[in-house]
Amino acid sequence: TEPGETIVKGPAPDAVTPEVLMDNLRRAMRDRDKDLYESVLDPSFWFTETDCAGDLVLANGFEQEIEFLGGSRDGSREGIFDIFREFEYDFQLIQEYIELGPDYPEAFEGDPDGHPEEDWQVFRGRVQMLMLDENGDGFRVDQIMTYKLRLADNGLWKIVRWIDDPLSGDCGAGKRLTKRYNWSNVKLTANR
């Protein structure tokens, strides 16, 4: 493409495979597309991030996730997609596997990790994000993340769990050489 040339994209394809879903996630993030982002999430979506001690940093469900990224449904609050003019997102696959349902019984009623009746496709990898506002200020995220996908009743794949690993620099006694943010920190800071 030539400088200044506009690229017109067609609608995102239906997530009929886990790979298409992951491509749609990438596209939703890079294009800051609220509707596409919502379409990749399962209604029972659950996000968690813990620190190195295993303590919960952040946990949120579907509606709060939509508000974090897309803003409030009534338009009274901006989301991350509104705040930043540039959003780079890259996922580098480390491991792909299937969680067999019988191996994941519900530990308690409503357990977001229990899925004894269905198998989930899992993508674990390194995610790098760069978010910049109109002043060039923003956040850089470089973190290991795990996405767990389920096949919905309509035949489309959806993200049902998103689990962020603690930042490796937070686990040891060493000092970080650069300022990096975990995804939970960005979600909470940008939505103040």
Give the residues covered by each predicted segment.
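A mature extracytoplasmic/lumenal domain signature
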Residues: 41-44, 51, 125-127, 163
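Sec/Tat-exported extracytoplasmic proteins
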Residues: 25-33, 41-45, 69-77
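Surface-exposed, charged secondary-structure patches
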Residues: 57-139
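A short gly/proline-enriched turn/hairpin at secondary-structure junctions
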Residues: 46-58
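Short beta-strand edge/turn micro-motifs at domain boundaries
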Residues: 1-7, 111-192
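Short, low-complexity N-terminal intrinsically disordered segments enriched in polar/charged residues
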Residues: 1-31, 39, 50
